[in-house]
Amino acid sequence: RSVIFFRGEIAMYDIIIAGGGPAGMTAAIYARRSGKSVLLLEREGYGGQIAYAPRVENYPGVASVGGAELAERMLEQMLALDAETDVGEVLSVERAGENFTVRTEDGVYESRAVILATGAKHRHLGLPDEEELLGHGVSYCAVCDGGFYKNGVTAVVGGGDSALQEALLLSDICRTVYLIHRRDAFRGDAEKQARLFARKNVTVLTPMEIAGFLTEDDSLRALRLKNTATGEETELGVDCLFVSVGQQPELERFAALLPLTAQGYAAVPETGETPVRGVFVAGDCRGKRVRQLATAVSDGANAALAACRYLDGEE
C-alpha cells in the first residue's frame, strides 16, 4: 500500500484523478500498480457514459455485458488495488508550488500530479421523457447499440459528420434508416453524404426537427416531427432514435491549464501531457477522432504512465 502524506489537515496524494469513467478508472489502476497513491474524484456514478449502455459487445475479451456491470467490474478492480475515492465535482485545479490544490464543493485536496478525465457528454435534445427513454428506444451511440436493432426501423437526428457516420453504420444492419435534420443542407463530409443518400434503405427528412416522443409500455413507439419551414407535424414510427447532435466536453473550468480546440476538447497528444507539467488529460475530453470505450481505456493507461514518469523524474 502506498503512503499518503498529510500537510496540516490536507492529504497529499501522488495523483488525483478527476472523473470516474473508464479513462479515469484505468488511470487509477495503472497508477496504483506503479505504486503511486491515488485519489479519484467522481461527482455522480462510476463508469461514465458506458454505465448507461444496455449492452457492451465491442470490448475485447467480453462478448456481451451490461454497461453498468462492466463499470462495476472496473470499480471493483480499482478498489482492490487500494485506490481511494471520494464524491465530488472538481471545480478547480491550481498550482501550489511544485504541487497542485484540487477543490470540490465539499473539500480541498493536494497532489503532485493531476489527471483530468472529465469526459464529454452527448448533447441531448432537451425533450420531455428523453432521459427516461435512454435504453428504451433512445440512444446516443450507434456503434454501441445499433446491433440491438438489426433489421429494425431506426432514425438518426443530426446534420454533422457524426450523424452521417451513425446513419451509414445503421444502414448496414437496419431495414430502414431515417436521417432527420432541421435544415435542408448537411454540414457533414460531402463524400459521406453521397454514400449515404445512395443507399436504398435510407430516407432523408428535412427540414425537420423532433418535437416529441410517443411511447408505449415505457418504450419509444414513434417520433413527433415538425417541419421547420411549414410548422406541419407528423408521426414517424421507429424502434430507436439515435441522437447525434454533438458532444460537449467538460473542460471549460480548466481552460487556463491546457489548450482547447474550437469545440472545447483538450488539444494534447496521446500521452495526455499538457503545457503545465504535472497535469494530464485522458478520455473523451481529449481531442481525437474516435471516442469509444477502448480508446478511453487506452487514454487512461497512457496518461497514468506519463504521470508516473513525471513523478519519477523520467520525462
Predicted feature residues:
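Glycine/small-residue-rich loop that forms an oxyanion/phosphate-binding "nest" at active or ligand-binding sites
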Residues: T85-E105, Y109-G147
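FAD-site-proximal beta/loop scaffold in flavoenzymes
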Residues: G126, E132-F148, V245-Q292, D299, ...
